[in-house]
Amino acid sequence: MRRFVYCKVVLATSLMWVLVDVFLLLYFSECNKCDDKKERSLLPALRAVISRNQEGPGEMGKAVLIPKDDQEKMKELFKINQFNLMASDLIALNRSLPDVRLEGCKTKVYPDELPNTSVVIVFHNEAWSTLLRTVYSVINRSPHYLLSEVILVDDASERDFLKLTLENYVKTLEVPVKIIRMEERSGLIRARLRGAAASKGQVITFLDAHCECTLGWLEPLLARIKEDRKTVVCPIIDVISDDTFEYMAGSDMTYGGFNWKLNFRWYPVPQREMDRRKGDRTLPVRTPTMAGGLFSIDRNYFEEIGTYDAGMDIWGGENLEMSFRIWQCGGSLEIVTCSHVGHVFRKATPYTFPGGTGHVINKNNRRLAEVWMDEFKDFFYIISPGVVKVDYGDVSVRKTLRENLKCKPFSWYLENIYPDSQIPRRYYSLGEIRNVETNQCLDNMGRKENEKVGIFNCHGMGGNQVFSYTADKEIRTDDLCLDVSRLSGPVIMLKCHHMRGNQLWEYDAERLTLRHANSNQCLDEPSEEDKMVPTMQDCSGSRSQQWLLRNMTLGT
């Protein structure tokens, strides 16, 4: 009896696969006669699902753990690309991934006539497995009628397998894949410009070379551009672990911002944006800035808005420059929450830059500050004083672009697009806060959130001793505010919450006192127990409770 049941199961399974084979054979043979683009678009995804063994390493985005015996070899290979190359090479180039979209996204219907796109991917000495996994994920999870081409821009790679071997391999793929070779190491910005110039699609989609696109990633991006060609759209960027290549869904409740040092940062989506969307998390999020690695833009609009600043070097700052330019010049920037693309986030870069990473990024950031930030560039210069010594080249062409596009001032951007910015729109002072008694200055000591603010000899060089007393009566250093939560308690640096309370300080310009409103105590000099941190004491009017708020300027 058991044998009979077993035979029936085997026969049923075999019959099912025969029917699948027949279906695919008929489907392929009739594909050229098919007019329904949506039906054709099912082919790559269907083929990928049927062909995948979901029990293999890394399938469904699961972590790959390397045995102890191979740990030393794994560590050596890790140094090549600054991610676990051994784990990556064990994973199939077209591995399966979970559907991490919100439930409401899975049932959305998009217009039939969407613009097509060229996908531009820049690489330099990229690992074979991560580069090809990026390409396969684009091809397998994109409707082919929307995929004009994939353009791989080789930024002067030195590895042999990225030469003829790669050229021969991509010829076998079912979507046109073009390889463009840069004559010399040019960096991400100029390589992307080269790829964009060669593109034919109505939309350009930029991806990094170590990404994985998920099911339904492309249609929501293109649909939003179809609605408004001046909208630049980004997917939610999911995290691919650099250690295990585990695929982890990113949050739809964060958006892009930046701090005084012009470092891109993720911050919680504010309530005002949730209210604008009426609580519908499947609607796009308006974001002040983008991370810059992954986005789609109408090709003609990319030209109209000024592409990239070609005077910038290699990488860094181009994402904020483009973000400011889009918003200030009449466009909009959004995170489309129904689109998910994974990205390998590395703890360190494997690349070297001429002059060093810091020099390159400082030059790029100074260019964007000079062109787009108006008087608010002082926040950047004062907290990063070394930047003013960097030669940033000629920005006259970019300033002319701003004039021709009739772009709005940076104050408008802060007021209307990023009102919760870490840069206050109105403030009383920007510079040092000096104690009259000790002649020492408040100093953040390079400390992080939840740590005590310090006090140190004044050096007049900005940096860690730059604080802003804002019109909202906060004392800010970068994106942290001075906070006191209990009587005589320590002065802690916490994320600015803009709700006053423990972060509200009253400065008396006559008595020179800084009174904490909630505790009704005054900021005082350090105690004998710890001479490196200020204290909170009952207000007495003593010299030790007197502070000079000085505006600082640096020659630029």
From Swiss-Prot:
GO terms for cellular component: Golgi membrane. It is found in: Golgi apparatus membrane. The chain crosses the membrane at residues 5-27. This is Polypeptide N-acetylgalactosaminyltransferase 13. GO terms for biological process: protein O-linked glycosylation; protein O-linked glycosylation via serine; protein O-linked glycosylation via threonine. There are two conserved domains in the glycosyltransferase region: the N-terminal domain (domain A, also called GT1 motif), which is probably involved in manganese coordination and substrate binding and the C-terminal domain (domain B, also called Gal/GalNAc-T motif), which is probably involved in catalytic reaction and UDP-Gal binding. The ricin B-type lectin domain binds to GalNAc and contributes to the glycopeptide specificity. Its cofactor is Mn(2+). GO terms for molecular function: carbohydrate binding; metal ion binding; polypeptide N-acetylgalactosaminyltransferase activity. Substrate binds at D155, R185, W315, R346, Y351. It is an enzyme of class 2 (transferase). The lineage of its organism: Eukaryota, Metazoa, Chordata, Craniata, Vertebrata. Disulfide bonds join C105-C338, C329-C407, C441-C458, C481-C496, C522-C539. Pathway: Protein modification; protein glycosylation. Its EC number is 2.4.1.41. It catalyses: L-seryl-[protein] + UDP-N-acetyl-alpha-D-galactosamine = a 3-O-[N-acetyl-alpha-D-galactosaminyl]-L-seryl-[protein] + UDP + H(+); L-threonyl-[protein] + UDP-N-acetyl-alpha-D-galactosamine = a 3-O-[N-acetyl-alpha-D-galactosaminyl]-L-threonyl-[protein] + UDP + H(+).
